[in-house]
A protein has these predicted regions:
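C-terminal accessory/binding modules appended to enzymatic or scaffolding proteins
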Residues: 1-10, 161, 166
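Phosphate/diphosphate-binding loops
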Residues: 42-54, 58-67, 71-72, 79, ...
Length: 167
């Protein structure tokens, strides 16, 4: 991500991997960051991204946050990270899209892009809420139950019944 942004004319302050949240907040403030990018390759990174978003909010930082990496998703970004941060939080699937998004946010489309993002994220959160709250009436659940005709199934009998002791 850093190389792609640098090749597109952006100054990048690369803090490396496994960077503590406090250091990210300090760097964002010290450099007056226009954008902040977080990338996660493993599942624990998702919790750390939430912590960073919360810490940035508490420090009063509102720069757009770009979320990417193998374990991330638009749904997780909308449902878990964005609510913890006052600035816009974008899920970026492809690292090559970071400079495109950054340029869009630097231009006349900034407010429109942020408004669209917030609308889409609200839609995702509402869909997730509906799916989490969805339950079937008992009659429908019984209608959908698994039906197995055991008389037609070939069951394999064990070759030995009882207890065996191995030395």
């Amino acid at each position: 991500v850093a190389v792609i942004l640098a090749c597109n004319g952006f100054e990048v302050i690369d803090l490396g991997v496994m960077t503590p949240s406090e250091r990210i907040v300090e760097a964002a403030i010290a450099h007056n960051a226009d954008y902040i990018g977080l990338s996660g390759l493993i599942t624990p990174s998702l919790d750390e991204m939430c912590r960073v978003a919360r810490d940035l909010r508490e420090a009063g930082v509102r720069a757009p946050l770009f979320i990417g990496g193998a374990t991330t998703s638009a749904l997780h970004t909308a449902a878990k990270i964005a609510p913890l941060y006052d600035g816009p939080v974008f899920h970026v699937k492809d690292a090559a899209q970071n400079p495109v998004l950054a340029m869009r946010l630097a231009g006349d489309e900034r407010e429109r892009a942020i408004a669209c993002l917030r609308f889409e994220q609200e839609q995702l959160r509402q869909r997730m809420q509906r799916e989490e709250n969805a339950s079937l009436p008992a009659s429908e659940a019984l209608r959908r139950k698994l039906h197995i005709d055991w008389s037609k199934e070939r069951l394999v009998a064990p070759t030995y019944e009882g207890v065996r002791i191995f030395d």
